[in-house]
Amino acid sequence: MSKMLYIIGLSTLLFSCASQKPSTTRKASARTTTTTAKTPVKPGPVTGVPASRPGLTVLHGVEFYTQNIGDITKNDNTMSHGSIVVAKPAGYHVVKTYFPAVAQNFRQRYVILHYTALDEDKSASVLTQQAVSSHYLINNKRNDEIYQLVDENKRAYHSGISAWRKDKNLNDTSIGIEIVNPGFTTDASGRKIFVPYDEHQIKKLAALLKDIVNRYQIPPTNVLGHSDVAPTRKQDPGPLFPWKKLYDQYQIGMWYDEAAKQGFMTQMTPETFMMEQSNSTFIFKVQTFLQQFGYDINPTGAWDKENMKVVEAFQYRFRPENYSGVVDMETWAILQALVQKYPQK
């Protein structure tokens, strides 16, 4: 397994130095030099040389920018978690006199979690040799290793047709993490029986997620499961994935406030809810709330197989005790509490 994969530990800094030329033997260690980039002139005519500022580092001729001078409130960030890719136009020299512009951010705006539904060897084989991939693979071994399969700056093929809130095709903007887990089996009644995750896998995943969401400023609303972004097609990471534990113990992802849920529960009696449950106006409202929260659903005022899968996906994550695809009173209260806590901007 270790021969096929580039294995990483839990490191907070990744350098993509693939563009280096093979080095020759040296008596001294490789020398790191630091140059300074210049601050752009303020709007108006250029009247002189901009003041310099630190941050641009050169290692073996490969450049890195290690500081953020962007507006953090706008999610702008100038830091490079890897080498800077620079054009090499024939006959011309690209300079960084005014590098970096403050108006930029990361491609990586989402993290999407999956289970592999395979054992470790098959998971590694499929994710590295077929037309599907992920950036990271969490193994099921009790060690300190996490497998990296794709450069974070590259697009992995893990989510397929996907959507969340205003964004679609989330492979373009996400980091994919696969977890070795069998997924589910089906009992005689057709009900899915999911397999729990090992505690050591969750610890690895939490450390990896902490690093990624901190580096790329990924908000809680953008840490998602495959079933969140493709609810009519996918079930992973399933109802036994510990979303609440990630939220409570590691401050990762979303969860509702219990007090808010209870408040919404008291707004309708069980008898009233039973009467409203089949009302088209009420159904349309529930579907609209699912859409407002982020799910790709078209409100129709009626339940069908497709939009019940959206409810099921929501329950996998936030109501795992009941993932029937039917909106009960508690599911409705949880949905309202989440829309209130995490409104779309």
Where are the predicted features?
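Second-shell loop/turn segments in exported
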Residues: 99-100, 122-124, 163-166, 189-200, ...
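Active-site-adjacent loop/helix surface patches within enzyme catalytic domains
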Residues: 24-219
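Sec-dependent signal peptide recognition
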Residues: 2-8
